[in-house]
C-alpha cells in the first residue's frame, strides 16, 4: 500500500463528476490506515503521508460523498478491519429474558451538534440496564466538541476504563447488565488518524463513524443520534448495511440535537431488519407524548465530568426526583430511557417506558447495575 495508490484515489475524487466508488473509499481508507502507522516521527516521509492523506480527506468532504450511505458503511467496515472485535457467545435465554432471549442495546450519537448537553445517552443506558430483560452494552468515546463525553463521565464515576478491552469483555459479559466500552481501546485505526484530524481542523468522514463501530456483534437493537436532518436518512441506510440484523432508531432533535430532544420535536427513522426490503419508517416524538413538560436545552446543559457524575449518582440515581417534579435533567434522562425501553419491546407506549425508567431508578436497580460494573472492572 503506497502513497501513489492513495494519490490515484484522490484523482478519482477530483474528476468531474467524481469517479470514486464506495468500494474505492473502503480501499483508500485501508491504505490511509496502513500509511499512518508509519508516521511516528517528523520525517520527510511522514510529512508527505500527512499531506496526501489531508488532500484525500478534504477532497472527499468537498464532494459530500462521505455523507452517502454506501460510502459511510464502507468507511466503517474499513476501520473495523483495524479494530479489536469481541468474540462472544450469546447469553442463554434465561439469563436475561426467559421468554424471548436477551435484548442487547446500545445508545450513542455522532456528536458534533455543538449543544453541549448533559450526558443523557450514558445516563439513559445506565437507567435502562436496571430494567428487567435489558442488557446495555454502550460504546463511546471521550469529549471532542463538548466538555464531557461518555468516557469522561464513566471514568469520573470510578470505572478504570483501561481494563476494559477485547480480552476482558468476555469476562465481564455474563454478570453485567450495564457495560461501557471506550472506543480508543478497540479501534487502533482511529488512533492513527487522530493527529491528522486535529491537523486538518475540519470534519471528515471519521466524524460520523463512531456509532457504526461497535466491537460487539451481539447488540441487536440500538439508538443512533445524528446532528443533522440531511444526514439522518443516509445514516439509517448505512446502519442497515453495517448492522444488517439490528433494529435501529436514528434520531434527530429539531433543535439540532443528536438525541431525543427535551424540547420541540424529534424525528425518528426506524430500521426494521425483519422487513423484506429496506424501507425507512419515520415518526416524530415530543415530550408531551411521554407525559413530560418541555425543557430548554440550557436547563439540560453539561457541567463537566465531575459535576455531571455527581448529579447522576447523587441526585438522579439516588431517587431524589420523581415524575412530575419537572427537573430538566431527570426528565431528559427518563425520556431517552423510555425510547430505549420501547425499542426493546417493539412498541411505542412511551408512557409505559417512563414508568419502567422510574421503577429502575427508585428500586435502586439502575445504581446497582452501574456499581456492579465498576466493581467487576476493578476486580479484573
Curated annotation (Swiss-Prot):
GO cellular component, as recorded: cytoplasm; cytosol; nucleus
Annotated keywords: Amino-acid biosynthesis, Aromatic amino acid biosynthesis, Glycosyltransferase, Transferase, Tryptophan biosynthesis
Pathway named in the protein's UniProt entry: Amino-acid biosynthesis; L-tryptophan biosynthesis; L-tryptophan from chorismate: step 2/5
Protein residues bound to Mg(2+): 258-259
The reaction(s) this protein catalyses: N-(5-phospho-beta-D-ribosyl)anthranilate + diphosphate = 5-phospho-alpha-D-ribose 1-diphosphate + anthranilate
EC code(s) of this entry: 2.4.2.18
Chain sites annotated for binding 5-phospho-alpha-D-ribose 1-diphosphate: 109, 119, 121-122, 142, 144, 146
Recorded family membership: Belongs to the anthranilate phosphoribosyltransferase family.
PANTHER family: ANTHRANILATE PHOSPHORIBOSYLTRANSFERASE
Function of the molecule: Catalyzes the transfer of the phosphoribosyl group of 5-phosphorylribose-1-pyrophosphate (PRPP) to anthranilate to yield N-(5'-phosphoribosyl)-anthranilate (PRA), the second step in tryptophan biosynthesis.
Identification of the protein by name: Anthranilate phosphoribosyltransferase
Origin species: Saccharomyces cerevisiae (strain ATCC 204508 / S288c) (Baker's yeast)
Amino acid at each position: 500500500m503506497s502513497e501513489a495508490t492513495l494519490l490515484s484515489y484522490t484523482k478519482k475524487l477530483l474528476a468531474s463528476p467524481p469517479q470514486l466508488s464506495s468500494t474505492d473509499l473502503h480501499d483508500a481508507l485501508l491504505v490511509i490506515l496502513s500509511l499512518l502507522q508509519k508516521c511516528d516521527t517528523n520525517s520527510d516521509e511522514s510529512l508527505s503521508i500527512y499531506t496526501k492523506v489531508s488532500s484525500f480527506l478534504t477532497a472527499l468532504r468537498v464532494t459530500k460523498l462521505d455523507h452517502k450511505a454506501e460510502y459511510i458503511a464502507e468507511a466503517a467496515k474499513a476501520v473495523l478491519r483495524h479494530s479489536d472485535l469481541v468474540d462472544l457467545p450469546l447469553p442463554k435465554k434465561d439469563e436475561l429474558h426467559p421468554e424471548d432471549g436477551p435484548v442487547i442495546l446500545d445508545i450513542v450519537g455522532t456528536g458534533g451538534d455543538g449543544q453541549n448537553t448533559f450526558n443523557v445517552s450514558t445516563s439513559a443506558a445506565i437507567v435502562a440496564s436496571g430494567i428487567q430483560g435489558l442488557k446495555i452494552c454502550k460504546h463511546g468515546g471521550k469529549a471532542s466538541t463538548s466538555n464531557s463525553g461518555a468516557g469522561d463521565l464513566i471514568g469520573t464515576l470510578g470505572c478504570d476504563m483501561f481494563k476494559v478491552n477485547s480480552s476482558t469483555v468476555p469476562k465481564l459479559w455474563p454478570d453485567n447488565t450495564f457495560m461501557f466500552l471506550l472506543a480508543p481501546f478497540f479501534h487502533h485505526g482511529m488512533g492513527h488518524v487522530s493527529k491528522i484530524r486535529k491537523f486538518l481542523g475540519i470534519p471528515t468522514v471519521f466524524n460520523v463513524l463512531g456509532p457504526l463501530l461497535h466491537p460487539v456483534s451481539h447488540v441487536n437493537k440500538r439508538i443512533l443520534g445524528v446532528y443533522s436532518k440531511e444526514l439522518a436518512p443516509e445514516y439509517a441506510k448505512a446502519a442497515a448495511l453495517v448492522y444488517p440484523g439490528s433494529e435501529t432508531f436514528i434520531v434527530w432533535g429539531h433543535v439540532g440535537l443528536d438525541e431525543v430532544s427535551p424540547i420541540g420535536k424529534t424525528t425518528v427513522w426506524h430500521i426494521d431488519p425483519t422487513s423484506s426490503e429496506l424501507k425507512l419508517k419515520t415518526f416524530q416524538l415530543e415530550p408531551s407524548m411521554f407525559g413530560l413538560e418541555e425543557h430548554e436545552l440550557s436547563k439540560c446543559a453539561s457541567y463537566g465530568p465531575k459535576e455531571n457524575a455527581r448529579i447522576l449518582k447523587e441526585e438522579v440515581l439516588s431517587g431524589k426526583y420523581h415524575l412530575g417534579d419537572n427537573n430538566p435533567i431527570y426528565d431528559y434522562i427518563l425520556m431517552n430511557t423510555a425510547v430505549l425501553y420501547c425499542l426493546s419491546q417493539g412498541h411505542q407506549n412511551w408512557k409505559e417506558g417512563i414508568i419502567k425508567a422510574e421503577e429502575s431508578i427508585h428500586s435502586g436497580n439502575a445504581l446497582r447495575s452501574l456499581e456492579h460494573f465498576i466493581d467487576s472492572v476493578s476486580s479484573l
